[in-house]
């Protein structure tokens, strides 16, 4: 097979609006209808919205690790806070040193700068081999160097506040939000309450909360000790550090509530540490999140195939795993450039492939145009759930209904069985019990048969077998040809020359002429003989009449 042509749409951010506008001009058709396909073993499992993105937006979170205690409670919390600070410094000092080495590597110009830059990266990696992702992270760290310096310039004002979250904008090139998860705890427990607590209880509460936060910090930075500055922080780690205050930054960066959960599940929101100051216990993290463009008229439809029964054995439909539909146009979608969530696809670019007319006709409901491959084995799961109902191949497995009791049989030639709550309430398949709540209405096609002409060979073993049969047929044909050649070799070539053939034809023509003349002569003689016989008979009858007349006289 040759390479298939594809439709490639590069996705720089400046083209997002143009693509969205172009697609919005196309009339939106209904989703791919799976009702006529289910009985043919092709199941539409769901749709997802298609989005394009580029990681272009950044913002900074300044995590205030050390909380400010109320003046009247500082003495009570002094001991646990000092222990917390010592542990915190021990845990995060490797991170700060790694960040500082990489940022200082750009102080030299020219080729030496490049060598120092790579050397700083390799010095931060345990095995001495820097991956492309780590070099990219280090480059981002260098770019954030000025922003980190600006944040450190404001560290006194950041550490002095008792607010759990507030914007830091003075002299910064990007949005920065100072958050303090521990400060939030202190405010909730001590600053914003009139309840009087004794010193022992304050010490215990602060100590327990600090230990819990240290555990979270260890969870975040523990796996990064080997290369602390070069590993991205996940959204979960960011929430562990910042608490619920993380939402404030995301909202400021333009992430809507309807999009937030989907983006969190995609893993596209990440963070990179850009500074750690042990004196003030400030941790700076640059957060990167995507700029997303939604293609309103484009959706991705997911297809699954079920092993069906045919007269040639079990087979599966040859259809794409994912197709995309815009208006009446359906093409195969390459999802290798996309990140999937439960409801969305986030793609850096959109790559589609045109489908053959047969597959296009098949997906539009013409099941007689669907092609099947005998590649599914007998151990393939012969059933699939769909919206509270079951599509099963009851020839491959026993479909036992527990309520009402009975065995569901599959008619001869029927590809699969559609089982819903009207035919069985509780279904048992291979020891798995399912309670059915859905139904297949009258719009679902049933009793579909797969013709022999629709089943083709695509598996490697089957193709090898077919090639073996073809080779045997060719060998037999060659044997027949050799036998024919041997017989032809015995023919006298002189007898088959041109002059001999002309002579044979001439003699044959003369023989035919003689034969025809002989036949005409024979017919003439027979006719003449019959005429003579008639004359003699007339003469005889006439003579006899005369003799009788003479006798009477």
Swiss-Prot record:
Topological category with respect to the lipid bilayer: Single-pass type I membrane protein; Single-pass membrane protein
Residues where lipid is bound covalently (S-palmitoyl cysteine): 523
Record topology, Cytoplasmic segments: 522-553
Chain intervals for the UniProt region annotation (Fusion peptide): 117-141
Disulfide bonds: 76-199, 338-347, 362-370, 394-399, 401-424
Pfam families per the UniProt record, alphabetical: Fusion_gly
Residue intervals annotated with topology Extracellular: 32-500
Gene3D superfamilies per UniProt: 1.10.287.2480, 6.10.10.110, Head and neck region of the ectodomain of NDV fusion glycoprotein, Newcastle disease virus like domain
Main location: virion
Annotated site residue numbers, Cleavage: 116-117
Signal peptide segment: 1-31
Keyword Nucleotide-binding on entry: no
Transmembrane region(s): 501-521
InterPro entries, sorted: Fusion_F0_Paramyxovir
Top-rank taxon: Viruses
One GO location term (cellular component): host cell plasma membrane
Glycosylated sites: 85, 191, 366, 447, 471
Biological process per Gene Ontology, one example term: fusion of virus membrane with host plasma membrane
Keywords tagged on the record: Cleavage on pair of basic residues, Coiled coil, Disulfide bond, Fusion of virus membrane with host cell membrane, Fusion of virus membrane with host membrane, Glycoprotein, Host cell membrane, Host membrane, Lipoprotein, Membrane, Palmitate, Signal, Transmembrane, Transmembrane helix, Viral envelope protein, Viral penetration into host cytoplasm, Virion, Virus entry into host cell
Subcellular location: Virion membrane; Host cell membrane
The keyword Nucleotide-binding appears for this protein: no
Record text on subunit structure and interactions: Homotrimer of disulfide-linked F1-F2.
Family to which the UniProt record says this protein belongs: Belongs to the paramyxoviruses fusion glycoprotein family.
Function: Class I viral fusion protein. Under the current model, the protein has at least 3 conformational states: pre-fusion native state, pre-hairpin intermediate state, and post-fusion hairpin state. During viral and plasma cell membrane fusion, the heptad repeat (HR) regions assume a trimer-of-hairpins structure, positioning the fusion peptide in close proximity to the C-terminal region of the ectodomain. The formation of this structure appears to drive apposition and subsequent fusion of viral and plasma cell membranes.
Protein name: Fusion glycoprotein F0
Encoding gene, per UniProt annotation: F
